[in-house]
Amino acid sequence: MPPIPHVRPENVLRRAEELIAVGQPAAALSVLHEHVTSKRSRSSPIASLEPVMLLFVELCVDLRKGKSAKDGLYQYKNIAQNTNVGTIEMVLKKFIELAEQKVTEAQAKADEIQSSLESAAPTSNVEDLDAIETPETILLATVSGEQSRDRTDRAVVTPWLKFLWETYRTVLEILKNNARLEVMYQATALQAFQFCLKYTRKTEFRRLCELLRNHVQNAAKYSAQMHAINLSDPDTLQRHLDTRFQQLNVAVELELWQEGFRSVEDIHTLLNLSKRQPKNIMMANYYEKLTKIFMVSDNYLFHAAAWNRYYNLLRQSAIALAAGQGSKKDSPSVTEADMTKAASFVLLSALSIPVISTSRSRGALVDVDEVRKNKNTRLTNLLGMPQPPTRASLFKDALNKGLLSRCRPEIRDLYNILEVDFHPLSICKKISPILKEIGADPEMEKYVLPLQQVILTRLFQQLSQVYESVELKFVHELAHFPEPFQVTSSMIEKFIMNGCKKGDLAIRVDHVSGVLTFESDIFSSAKALHPGSAAGSAESEVGSVQRLQSTPAEIARSQLARLAKTLHVTCMYVDPSYNQARIKAKEAAHARARAGAAKEHEETLTRRAIIEKRKEALSDALQKKQREEENRKRARNQQLQEAEQQRLLDEHRERERKRMKDEQDRIRQQELKKQLEELKTGVKGIDVNQIDLEELDSNRLRAIKLAQLEKEKNDLNEKIRITSKRIDHLERAFRREELKHLPEDYETQKKQDLETYEQTKEETLKAARQKHKEDVALKHRLSRLVPYFNDFKKSVTEKRHEEFERRRKAADREFEQKKKQRIKEVHERIRRERAEREAEEQRRREEEERIAREEQERIAKEEERRRALAEEKAAREEQRRKLDEQAIRQRQREEEAEQRRAARKAGLAEPRGPAREASPERTAPRLNLAGRTGTSWRDRQAAKAAASAGEQPAAAQEATPAPPAKAGSYLPPHLRATRDGPSDSRDLSHARESAAPPRQFSRSPVPPSGAPSSQEKPGPWRPRFKQQQ
């Protein structure tokens, strides 16, 4: 059956355009959405579906129907992803461009509204130019001045921003985990990042990052699907890395440090998966963003480590470029100024690392703190360092690479003051000019506060080595910093309390006497009593603090060690053999060490050779395995493609079959429902809900309808009969009873009507009097306004009249213009109709001539056919006549031959006996031998044949007897049968069969020539089928 209307994409597109033209875009969108999401559209060609999708996304954007767009785009992706990926990218790009265009238009509209409000505000509401700033205007500006822009944005721009965000999210969901659409996916993600950055959408940026993270996590889960992305592919992984680096940049720009840190973790995960070495420029950006993240999180140790890694990368890139081993495109541009700046930041960040712990709890004192350990391990892995960094290791690495010679002079002086020549009494005087220079630099200003913490820590550690107690005033004088970095007494006390709380310091503050007392319990195990240990600090190396002298606690703790050293020196002087034995043992140990080193060296060489061989074997095996894996993967992919093609073909066939079946079922159901609705509305008493549509057909429905109509007709007739009978009797009884009460009811009704009339009359008169009084009072009250009303009415009338005249003239002009245009259109239409009529008349004449010409040709062909049939019929008649004549002549010849054969038989059989004449068998010729008495065996056989010949049919007796042959004359061999015996009967039968059609002849004796024949003379010849009838 033909498809229903508007199934083809061209018809749907035409219908949607018609609906848009009449101002019904919602209906057009509904038509397009129904067609796009329909299963029938899967079999439509992509070239015809593409314009439909373009119009569909345009309407979705205009009407802000994000969900409808998502459904349609998902369906279109499933249809086109196996055939044409370019059309999917084009439609999605169009979708994003339209959404971005709407946002731009909304912004322009909001700016226009705001500018109009701002330009209209000073003039429209100002009544006195001398008093512009009235209390009312000030209050209005205070209440709504700053919020008008926000309200305008919320009403105009925000809905389109929300729709644009939904657009990006929808496109990313459609393109996710598809290798053929991967480039478009990455480009859309970058556009979404720019959207978040341009409009400062922090919440949407967090959701976008989480969405991309989920897509990468699900990539491994759906790796078995067709067109799934492969993160092992270097190009794919590089594109994901570029996206994550852009994500990190946007997170830093938006100051979303938590998202930035998660982005760093994502980048680190992808770098671990990558088999290709990442570009230096990317890693430089990576470490640079890490420095910002660690600085915001107050993690100065890993902030300095990130700067160290960044400087190392710049140094290696510069060395590689100088040696010509690297590409300038993949390496960051490095100048001497950049290296100096990076070196200064490396050293300054390392100096800013706190000497003591900066955590707010005492939990950092626990060395086995798993949380801190795990965190440091994660951060170390992010930086790509083999072990967690420390303050001392960072200084050591910086000194080994000569950063002191590269950094700025003030940073070098700061390092010497803090780490080389630290003097607590002159520290602030030396460091003040350096802090001023650092504070003047906006990028280095953030390091001033941690440097103050380091200086205070060094100061109190060295004071605790020299003094047991100091005055607060003395400490304040020592900790004097330049403005605006001045440290107050409260800040110093807060620092002391924080250090004591964490166990890094052991100081008591006496506010009464203004004295700081350092704890000196020699038997205490607190780490604060052992300055320089720095157990809770960022470094673990002992001796980072300059040792001035040993404290009593250290002296008590190292007493046994000092006693052991003294006894050892005494033994060396008292017993010289002890020293000699020690020297010999040392030399023997050195000899064993040299021998072991040589042997270990040989073993190392051997092991290295073995390892190289194993590496080569492993590399060969791995390459072989990779080749086999690639071959298997290629074969598997080919099988999957063939299976997928077969599956798609089967699915297409199944869909077509199912579509045809569903279409037939739908049409049948529609017809049945339509008939049921007609039955429901036309016939009462039928419960349509109880009828099963699956088991219903038109015949049963017709039978149900006829049965119900018959039932209704019978019920109606019965009701009419019963009702008519009841009404007749009841009405007669009512009227008889009513006659008794009619006069009384008439009098009562007349009295009630009179009373009602009087009451209504009185109420009407009273209401009229009251209304008249009120109207008179209103007239006197309003009469004063009549002159003003008349003046106003006159002015309004004049204005209306002028407006009327103006509009009437405009209408007249427009009427004349329309009239001329209408006249022109009518003339054009008449001319066009006349041309069409002439063309139609010409076409009709040509059609009539063509029909007449075809009729003549048909008549001529019919005459020719009849003439040919007549000739053919005459030829057949002539041939049939010739055949009949031939048959008659043949029959005559056969009859003559029969007569001659019969005559010959009759003439030759007379001198023979009856027994010999009746013998049907052929015998040998008689010999002239001596006679004998009795009958021979031939005579007996002839007698038997004669006896049996009487039972044969009489057909053989039809032949006419031939004249007898003369005695002694010659007879041919085929005519000797009747004279010498029946020996030639078979030859005669064979001759008859060859001369005429086969007939049945009798072998009975031929009667004499004078005997009458039992058969009449045969008539004319007839065909055999007529003879058989």
UniProtKB/Swiss-Prot annotation:
Region (Disordered): 621-666, 797-1029
Keywords attached to this entry: Coiled coil, Cytoplasm, Initiation factor, Protein biosynthesis, RNA-binding
Coiled-coil segments: 92-121, 606-903
GO cellular component, one term: eukaryotic translation initiation factor 3 complex, eIF3m
Gene Ontology biological process: formation of cytoplasmic translation initiation complex; translation reinitiation
Domain PCI residues, every copy: 339-523
Pfam families: eIF3a_PCI_TPR-like, PCI
Presence of the UniProt keyword Protein biosynthesis in the record: yes
Entry-linked SMART domains: PINT
InterPro entries recorded: EIF3A (IPR027512), eIF3a_PCI_TPR-like (IPR054711), PCI_dom (IPR000717)
Amino acid composition bias (Basic and acidic residues), ranges on this chain: 621-632, 644-666, 797-901, 913-924, 977-993
Subcellular localization(s) per the UniProt record: Cytoplasm
UniProt biased composition (Low complexity): 943-960
Superkingdom of this protein's organism: Eukaryota
GO molecular function: mRNA binding; translation initiation factor activity
Subunit structure: Component of the eukaryotic translation initiation factor 3 (eIF-3) complex.
Annotated family: Belongs to the eIF-3 subunit A family.
Function description: RNA-binding component of the eukaryotic translation initiation factor 3 (eIF-3) complex, which is involved in protein synthesis of a specialized repertoire of mRNAs and, together with other initiation factors, stimulates binding of mRNA and methionyl-tRNAi to the 40S ribosome. The eIF-3 complex specifically targets and initiates translation of a subset of mRNAs involved in cell proliferation.
Database matches in PANTHER family: EUKARYOTIC TRANSLATION INITIATION FACTOR 3 SUBUNIT A, EUKARYOTIC TRANSLATION INITIATION FACTOR 3, THETA SUBUNIT
Protein name: Eukaryotic translation initiation factor 3 subunit A
Organism of origin: Coccidioides immitis (strain RS) (Valley fever fungus)
Name of the coding gene: TIF32
